[in-house]
Every structure is written in C-alpha cells, then in structure tokens.
Amino acid sequence: MAFNKNLVIKVCGMRDEENIHAVEQLDVDWMGFVFYPESPRYMAQPLGFKNFPFDVKRVGVFVNEQKDIVRKTSLKNLIQVIQLHGSELPSYCRVLQLDGFEVMKAFSIDSERRFPVKKVRLYEKCCDYFLFDTRTSGYGGSGRKFDWDVLSDYRG
C-alpha cells in the first residue's frame, strides 16, 4: 500500500442526481454510494451515470456482501473504489484488486485508544486505502470522531 499524504475529500451516502450535482460544485474528490440494504442511505436502484462528473472517483460501500454481487453492482454503477465495512478477509480484498478495483478497508477504532495494528497489517498488501472510523454498534460512519493520536505510531 502506498502512503499518500494528500487530503482526499469524500462525501458518502449519495443517492439522487440533484444532490450529486450540488456536491460536485464543492469540488470533492470522491463520492460514495452505499450498497448495504440495512443503511438508511442505501442506493437500491442504480443511477444513470451519463451526466455524472467523471473527474470524481466513485466509491461503492459494501458490508459482508458476496464478491459476485460486489463486482456486478460496481460494474453496473461505474464504481472505481470498493469500500468494505464488514468482516471481509484479506483474500476477499485481493480478489477484488485483481479484478481491477481499488479497495478500501474500514477499521473501527474504539474509545479506549486501541488501534488494531496486527489486523491492519494483514491488509496492507491487498488494500489500496484504509479508512479508520469510530467504533459503533453497526456498520459505517457515525460522524463521531476518535482520538487521531492513536494512529501516530502506525507506518503503513
């Protein structure tokens, strides 16, 4: 995994075309589309991407989904980065990489400042990006922050 110190701005939970074009005006780098049926931001129907801003990377968010469904959904929606929030194994991530997708694996950080360094290291060769998020009872982002100092010793 290459370490990139550049800031990337991603807005996630995009569902309707009007909202997508409004966010595009903010000059974001990435837009996220949630394909997890339990999420309130679930995108059940694929968008028509003919008017989509193609200079923005499209991220598909999945949780413990079958690889074939991830592939088909991603291809249908022109997804470039697959973001995984479940218990997907490194081998699962590697298969998606070999299929030509960039892979982002999400890891939960708990309030006790414990960083899952051993677990993260298992994914270094099969993921292009990591997303560190505050632990919640469910999957996905909560909007709550954690103590970023917990990441200071990690050199991935």
What are these regions (language model features)?
Residues 1-156:
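Conserved N-terminal beta1-alpha1 strand-loop-helix module at the mouth
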